Amino acid sequence: MLRSIPRRVPRRLPIFTTTATAGGPSRLAQRAFTCGYLRMSPSSLPPVQPPVSSTLPSDSYQLLSTADKAGDAEDALYEQQIKDVEAWWNSPRFEGIKRPYSAADVVSKRGSLQQTYPSSLMARKLFNLLNERAAENKPVHTMGAIDPVQMTQQAPNQEVLYVSGWACSSVLTTTNEVSPDFGDYPYNTVPNQVQRLFKAQQLHDRKHWDARRKMTPEQRKSTPYIDYMRPIIADGDTGHGGLTAVLKLAKLFAENGAAAVHFEDQMHGGKKCGHLAGKVLVPIGEHINRLVATRFQWDMMGVENLVIARTDSESGKLLSSAIDVRDHEFILGVTEESEPLAETLQAMEREGAAPSEIDAFELDWVKRHKLVTFDEAVDAHLEAEGAPQAARDAYKKRVKENPDLSITRRRELANDYTKTPVVWSCDIPRTREGFYHYRAGFPAATKRAKEFGPYADLLWVETGDPNVEKAAKLAGEVRAALPGKKLVYNLSPSFNWMGQGFDEASLKSFIWDLAQHGFVLQLISLAGLHSGATITAELSRAFKDEGMLAYVRLIQAREKELGVDVLTHQKWSGAPYMDGIVGAIQSGSSSSKSMGEGNTEKGEFNPLVF
């Protein structure tokens, strides 16, 4: 964004110095202080366009006296920020992004103090990377990390870092109460993990930078640079509540270092891992509101962080509400009149039926009553009435032309072709919680992706199996409506990859095959969790019988062979770096340096021989 402010805002602030005289303090001098752009020496590095970090108009405003803030100055700041925001929104960064609010809506809610956030720079870095890979039909593929160790080992190889809500729920919550991925952990859990990893990235970046300054220019040129500042992509689950909760969560993510966050269209309180049963979806409009709330919060903060919209409708079979007509074509009902299922179950409970009896009755009821969409009910009704195929096809053609017709309008349309009213109810089979049954599958997922697309930077459809052909069909339909839209694919460890019919060649090319269809961001969400479990299990079993031989064979020798920097874990953790800082502050005391004499890492790790 352009960072300037009209001239009518005072730019020169009087700062007075005083001295005591017989008559009291007197004004001796007046020094002008100018609030403007940061003055930097000319740089050989290319400028960032548009700038991400620069002096903000609000900086000038904050340094005015209180008396000067009222009136013209505040109006000038407000008007300038509106112009800046509008120019920002018209930049290539937000091409194709829809906002149902105005720049004035955002600026009026910002307050007079603006800040800059490092996560916005990381977001620009991610945006540029995704654009570069998308232009080449190549992937940005990464793995979930659960701690700073995994982050540092991925940094030389993966270009982005992923933080999974599943992993946080099962490994590290802010209450230390670990559990399955039901989205019921405190909402600051994943942002805290993001902050932990973001701070670790900065430590290892500083450590690496310091180590390179000790090299000669020739050594620096020949030594590969490790970029520890990889953009972090994080799991926002359902947003953890209503829209105000989404706002606060989005703010926390941006403050803590996340470059991008994904939000899924499941119901808060009914959320399940995307590969579990029992998922409850929210109406299309409700999830769009979450995406808009996230964008609004980040617009208020002036950050470019990326919004990722995820849908679980390929397998989610329940819907929290039927209020959105865009969902109506996929809502299921029954074609015979009967007592509502929920009322029957409540009556059984009041009469003392055992939970197992109630569960068995509900399961049997659903099997006995075929669940169909209203359009399927109309077609069956026309067939039963002996209507000609032309009438059946005509109805199908009309609803295909306008798939967002409500159930009410569909009934009116059906009456044009039927002799008697269609019997169909989506309320009779509602669950005990009041949820509607929903026709999950790729048609529903495709529609939702298209609806979410204008409000999101990337789209993620959670799928039930790894299949390039299915993914390609989905991508083709979505990108026909949203040209160039970038897609996300979860290379989930929940899939039995060995049982999917892959040979080595197709398994190896899977990621790159997907990238040809627009799946530019791909991730193994729980790779860190599984890799840690695997090596720990192997070491634990061997250590039981082999003792230190197992540790040296499985860990130290492998660290040496692979060049893993954690082999010298004191150095990895930054001990020499901190010694350097302390040494710059205070001379002498070399005997108290952590990496001095007595440090067992010093000279200990020569090649290990067996």
Swiss-Prot record:
Deletion phenotype: Impairs growth with propionate as the sole carbon and energy source.
Transmembrane segments: none
Localization per record: Mitochondrion matrix
E.C. designation(s): 4.1.3.30
Keyword Zinc-finger attributed: no
Enzyme class: lyase
Pathway assigned in UniProt: Organic acid metabolism; propanoate degradation
Transit peptide: 1-40
Family per similarity comment: Belongs to the isocitrate lyase/PEP mutase superfamily. Isocitrate lyase family.
PANTHER family given in the database record: ISOCITRATE LYASE/MALATE SYNTHASE, MITOCHONDRIAL 2-METHYLISOCITRATE LYASE ICL2
Designated name of the protein: Methylisocitrate lyase, mitochondrial
Primary gene name: mclA
